């Protein structure tokens, strides 16, 4: 026979012992505040304490002291109350801190409860909201006060979190508009738009050219009635009911027109004409998924046109929250986590994650360090070239250019740090001119000597011929 209340009484007794400081053999210090607990309870409820206490199980006679600086004292108080009572006091202010501390202490149950609390607090579905908006006037007059009291609150009510019994979702910190009964007290208030009409207006917009029957309907009537309604005390309920009936009739007309136009949407052009886009008094565009039906898919996923949520054409990194549109970008991003560097440099062996990084490295490091002759622009090395200092400038010349300058007979035994110093500019110009003039004179003398020799040879041959004759 099992007693379901036994573990509850056991936890209550252990909690009473903790509060009275009885048999507490574990002290936890958080922000200078000491918390006393039993090591058996902490061992059974936390993976971190299980690992910590199993290493010090030999010292059973003395109490164990542990210090934490990763969370606050209030956060640890909430976790310790959960360990001894099974009740976790969560709120919108401490849920993130409690989940972070539970993750550090390896308490999976607390993490799951925090995730459920966050999801239920922030996830207010449109279906639940439509449940309030779709109430008829009859239901509102009969039992509308009880429903609105549970789910709706005015702007003056304090911010709190509670759970509705009918819809099963938390409503936290949201100022919804008051019900119809409270709007009737303000005759000059604006009537809100119906969410179903807003949704149809956002997802199914009709072109003006294909809906001549709807062109005479004002835009304000399509999205929820007139802009301002003057409500009197006697005709209030009747005007509201008539307005809702007229709105529902117009919604049915719109849905019928949309269904008729879906069959002919394949023959429409890829983009609507510019004239229909410029007119703002009517609805111009059809459903986006039909209008852009002929567009190609991107990497197996079609991006959602006109959707508020994240499109299915994106790729999410499994290690972080980064999302990309292309699979190649995701593959390149994963190298940040895996450490893969598939592009090595052939000159120095350094590896890179991206090809453009390798190109930039090669251009700035290796190609920028090439030795080039200043005069002929040919590549040189430390053996075939020499550093020349011209005043404050230093550059390198090859052996051919040094020979042209008349510096080929200079001794190059001293080091690279000591450059060859050129003579002053006037002497250097005279040297260059002298070499050029000497080269020209030598060429002219050689030409004249060749001519003289040729003439001598010709005269000797003529004399020999004359003698033979």
Swiss-Prot record:
InterPro entries: BTB/POZ_dom (IPR000210), SKP1/BTB/POZ_sf (IPR011333), Znf_C2H2_sf (IPR036236), Znf_C2H2_type (IPR013087), ZnFinger_BTB_dom_contain (IPR050457)
Subcellular location: Nucleus
Protein source organism: Xenopus laevis
Keyword line: DNA-binding, Metal-binding, Nucleus, Phosphoprotein, Repeat, Transcription, Transcription regulation, Zinc, Zinc-finger
ZnF (C2H2-type) residues: 315-337, 343-366
Task performed by this protein: May be involved in transcriptional regulation.
CDD domains, per the entry: BTB_POZ_ZBTB8A_BOZF1
Entry protein name: Zinc finger and BTB domain-containing protein 8A.1-B
GO cellular component: nucleus
């Amino acid at each position: 026979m099992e007693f379901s209340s036994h573990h509850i009484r056991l936890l209550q007794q252990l909690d009473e012992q903790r509060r009275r400081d009885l048999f507490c053999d574990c002290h936890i210090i958080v922000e200078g505040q000491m918390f006393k607990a039993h090591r058996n309870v902490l061992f059974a409820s936390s993976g971190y304490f299980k690992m910590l206490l199993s290493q010090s199980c030999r010292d059973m006679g003395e109490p164990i002291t542990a210090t934490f600086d990763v969370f606050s004292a209030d956060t640890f108080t909430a976790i310790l109350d959960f360990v001894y009572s099974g009740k976790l006091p969560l709120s919108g202010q401490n849920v993130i801190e409690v989940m972070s501390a539970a993750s550090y202490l390896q308490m999976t149950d607390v993490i799951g409860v925090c995730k459920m609390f966050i999801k239920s607090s922030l996830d207010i579905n449109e279906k639940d909201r439509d449940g309030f908006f779709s109430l008829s006037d009859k239901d509102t007059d009969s039992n509308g006060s009880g429903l609105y009291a549970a789910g709706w609150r005015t702007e003056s009510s304090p911010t709190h979190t509670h759970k509705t019994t009918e819809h099963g979702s938390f409503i936290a910190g949201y100022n919804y508009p008051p019900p119809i009964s409270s709007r009737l007290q303000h005759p000059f208030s604006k009537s809100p738009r119906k969410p179903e009409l807003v949704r149809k207006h956002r997802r199914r917009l009709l072109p003006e050219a294909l809906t001549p029957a709807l062109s005479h309907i004002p835009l304000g009537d399509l999205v929820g009635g007139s802009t301002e309604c003057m409500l009197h005390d006697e005709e209030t309920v009747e005007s509201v009911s008539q307005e809702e009936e007229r709105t529902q009739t117009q919604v049915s007309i719109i849905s019928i027109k949309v269904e008729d136009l879906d069959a002919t949407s394949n023959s429409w052009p890829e983009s609507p004409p510019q004239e229909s886009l410029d007119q703002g008094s009517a609805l111009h565009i059809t459903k986006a998924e039909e209008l852009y039906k002929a567009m190609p898919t991107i990497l197996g996923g079609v991006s959602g046109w006109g959707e508020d949520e994240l499109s299915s054409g994106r790729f999410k990194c499994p290690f972080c929250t980064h999302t990309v549109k292309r699979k190649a970008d995701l593959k390149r991003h994963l190298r940040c986590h895996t450490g893969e560097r598939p592009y090595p440099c052939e000159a120095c062996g350094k590896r890179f994650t991206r090809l453009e990084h390798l190109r930039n490295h090669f251009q700035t490091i290796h190609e920028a360090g090439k030795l080039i002759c200043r005069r002929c622009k040919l590549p040189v090395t430390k053996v075939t070239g020499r550093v020349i200092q011209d005043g404050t400038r230093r550059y390198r010349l090859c052996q051919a250019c040094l020979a042209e300058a008349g510096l080929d007979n200079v001794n190059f035994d001293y080091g690279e740090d000591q450059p060859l110093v050129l003579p002053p500019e006037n002497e250097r110009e005279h040297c260059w001119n002298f070499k050029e003039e000497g080269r020209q004179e030598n060429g002219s003398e050689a030409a004249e000597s060749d001519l003289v020799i040729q003439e001598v040879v010709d005269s000797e041959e003529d004399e020999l011929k004359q003698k033979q004759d």
